[in-house]
Amino acid sequence: MALNLKINRQIRAPKVRLIGSSGEQLGILNTKDALDLAREADLDLVEVASNSEPPVCKIMDYGKYRYDLTKKEKDSKKAQHQVRIKEVKLKPNIDEGDFSTKLKQARAFIEKGNKVKITCMFRGRELAYPEHGHRVVQKMSQGLEDIGFMESEPKLNGRSLICVMAPGTVKTKKKQDKINAQDEKQ
């Protein structure tokens, strides 16, 4: 985070519009007088608006101001949750034990709040029977429908059948669709 604010002796303007530490307007003063007021209050003189005439300066604790800004920035980064897309790869002729392992893996991803991309890969002549892949993907989505919903229907893309599951329930998806429909009307 780069703060390009001038403080104390870095302020070169002859006169400044001064704002006190509690936010009250103190008027236009010589920079030297403003610095003396800030020093008396044991605070810093910070130039907050350099593009106005005369520049606007505020009496504040600059170290605390920077600390608060960095803390707010960190808190806002923590609040953001980046949804990642995890992938689970299957084959159309997957065995039951392997399928249950992949289902547990996909369930863990969704419970952590990630989306899951289910990919059923066809090899050789398996592409002649895409219904086998559809059946495996459908079985996987049914196993996850209590904690997630199918965000995109299964699509054949080259030699792969792909669909995306998102965390939440069908009710959540219906609510989101309803909100989107209302937004489109407006």
UniProtKB/Swiss-Prot annotation:
<dbReference type="GO" id="GO:0016020">
    <property type="term" value="C:membrane"/>
</dbReference>
<dbReference type="InterPro" id="IPR019814">
    <property type="entry name" value="Translation_initiation_fac_3_N"/>
</dbReference>
<keyword id="KW-0648">Protein biosynthesis</keyword>
<dbReference type="InterPro" id="IPR036788">
    <property type="entry name" value="T_IF-3_C_sf"/>
</dbReference>
<comment type="subunit">
    <text>Monomer.</text>
</comment>
<comment type="similarity">
    <text>Belongs to the IF-3 family.</text>
</comment>
<dbReference type="InterPro" id="IPR019815">
    <property type="entry name" value="Translation_initiation_fac_3_C"/>
</dbReference>
<dbReference type="InterPro" id="IPR001288">
    <property type="entry name" value="Translation_initiation_fac_3"/>
</dbReference>
<keyword id="KW-0963">Cytoplasm</keyword>
<protein>
    <recommendedName>
        <fullName>Translation initiation factor IF-3</fullName>
    </recommendedName>
</protein>
<dbReference type="GO" id="GO:0043022">
    <property type="term" value="F:ribosome binding"/>
</dbReference>
<dbReference type="GO" id="GO:0005829">
    <property type="term" value="C:cytosol"/>
</dbReference>
<dbReference type="GO" id="GO:0032790">
    <property type="term" value="P:ribosome disassembly"/>
</dbReference>
<dbReference type="InterPro" id="IPR036787">
    <property type="entry name" value="T_IF-3_N_sf"/>
</dbReference>
<comment type="function">
    <text>IF-3 binds to the 30S ribosomal subunit and shifts the equilibrium between 70S ribosomes and their 50S and 30S subunits in favor of the free subunits, thus enhancing the availability of 30S subunits on which protein synthesis initiation begins.</text>
</comment>
<dbReference type="Pfam" id="PF00707">
    <property type="entry name" value="IF3_C"/>
</dbReference>
<dbReference type="InterPro" id="IPR019813">
    <property type="entry name" value="Translation_initiation_fac3_CS"/>
</dbReference>
<dbReference type="Pfam" id="PF05198">
    <property type="entry name" value="IF3_N"/>
</dbReference>
<keyword id="KW-0396">Initiation factor</keyword>
<dbReference type="GO" id="GO:0003743">
    <property type="term" value="F:translation initiation factor activity"/>
</dbReference>
